[in-house]
Regions:
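ATP-dependent carboxylate-amine ligase
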Residues: 1-166
């Protein structure tokens, strides 16, 4: 009833609990400096509340920032690091500045496929992964690839007769 029955809107802080024990937070619908700062703070706070899960920020470009685009992306990387985020995976030419600002623990990718492949290789229990970027960065495709990978793992586990398959 009411708020208890409310479902999050796709791409707006929607949480997915993956079979591997990863919490995937899909905030891929859009990004601007204010919403990104708030999402970083929410990720850091949720980690503290959940016993120190390893936190990952997967960031696509924030667009339409004009002459401030590079400094704002640098700030995003620095803010994520200062908030205690463990890793930053960045996609797109603007987000390269975020990776630079973050420093150790950051990687920059040129394609969605490269980023998704690298992230899938690192997924493990106790991770909280926030995906965020402007609509034009199409970060929802990263979320879709992670969810498809999780569904494929569930089907494989079910075929093997594993009890936990869902």
């Amino acid at each position: 009833d009411g708020l208890d029955a409310a479902q999050p809107v796709a791409g707006r802080l929607a949480s997915h609990h993956l079979r591997s024990g990863v919490v995937l937070v899909d905030d891929s619908y859009n990004a601007n400096p204010g919403s990104l700062d708030a999402a970083i703070e929410a990720l850091a706070a949720s980690t503290s509340a959940n016993g120190g899960d390893e936190t990952w920020l997967v960031l696509g470009d924030m667009r339409e920032l004009g002459a401030d685009e590079r400094p704002m992306h640098l700030h995003a990387g620095r803010h994520a690091k200062a908030a205690g985020i463990a890793h930053l995976y960045a996609l797109g030419p603007l987000s390269a500045a975020a990776a630079e600002g973050f420093g150790d623990g950051a990687r920059h990718f040129n394609t969605h496929a490269e980023l998704a492949e690298a992230l899938i290789a690192r997924l493990g229990a106790g991770m909280r992964v926030l995906v965020k970027g402007s609509r034009g960065s199409a970060m929802d495709s990263i979320v879709k690839q992670l969810l498809q990978h999780d569904a494929a793992n569930a089907r494989l586990a079910k075929a093997r007769g594993e009890v936990d398959a869902a």
